[in-house]
A protein has these predicted regions:
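Glycine-rich loops and low-complexity Gly/Arg-rich segments
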Residues: 24-26, 59-63, 122-124, 132-134, ...
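NAD(P)-dinucleotide binding in Rossmann-like oxidoreductases
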Residues: 72-170
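Broad hydrophobic/π-residue packing in well-ordered secondary structure
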Residues: 20-21, 100-102, 146, 189, ...
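Short, low-complexity, polar/charged sequence segments that are solvent-exposed and flexible
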Residues: 17-21, 54-57, 116-117, 126-129, ...
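C-terminal helix-rich "cap/oligomerization" subdomain common to oxidoreductases
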Residues: 80, 155-210
Length: 210
């Protein structure tokens, strides 16, 4: 996944967006085995070494409506990754490297300065090409996040069941907290036995809609 914003709060939103996609994998969510947060030039080095996928980053960036740099200046299209502009635009890159208990690996790249939206890409078993999407956000000034939240509260009170798994909130908070401990502990890889959280996401889509 990719995101921007440069704060713990924005990182949480990007992590949750990624989690709401990968929790739907076959077998459901199984929990997190380890995390590591790396920053700066080590992020690009990790990509070169294959610790995260350049191809998936390219697919995620292809969904962005807010590429900065030359596109922002004069509207031209550009390949942020292939041209090397991405590395010039992002002064303080951060990578959340997450390993799940079932073997899945996921990476959130916070690339503030390159894009201003949230995007996702993944490799599906048996498929040659990645699949990708952008998470559309409510535009300003009519930001309707609270209205969406209230609608889900109303749905829960009406049906007597939470419309989305509370475990998602718990696991995302745990990932963020553990990654911050990694950051302040020398960017070391940390095992996360406390994040052995298993659950299944609902089959229905819970995307915001008017």
């Amino acid at each position: 996944g990719t995101g921007g914003g440069g704060s713990d709060a924005m990182d949480y939103h990007a992590l949750e967006a990624m989690q709401c996609m990968i929790e739907r994998r076959r077998g459901g969510e199984t929990g997190v085995a380890s995390v590591q947060l790396i920053e700066g030039k080590k992020v690009w080095k990790a990509g070169d070494e294959g610790r995260w996928s350049m191809r998936l980053l390219e697919a995620a960036l292809s969904r962005s409506d807010s590429p900065q740099g030359l596109t922002h200046e004069d509207g031209r299209t550009q390949d942020l990754l292939g041209s090397g502009e991405l590395m010039k635009l992002v002064e303080k890159p951060a990578a959340y490297l997450i390993e799940f208990r079932d073997g899945l690996r996921a990476t959130l790249l916070m690339i503030n300065g390159a894009v201003a939206d949230y995007n996702f890409a993944c490799k599906l078993k048996g498929k040659a090409d990645p699949v990708s999407c952008q998470f559309f956000l409510s535009p300003t000034p009519n930001v309707t996040y609270s209205a969406c939240l209230v609608a889900k509260i109303d749905e829960m009170l009406t049906t007597g069941a939470a419309p989305f798994p509370a475990e998602r909130t718990m696991i995302v908070n745990g990932i963020l907290e553990s990654c911050l401990r990694s950051k302040h502990g020398g960017h070391k890889k940390l095992k996360t036995p406390h994040l052995e959280v298993a659950y299944r996401a609902p089959r229905e889509s819970h995307h915001a809609r008017s």
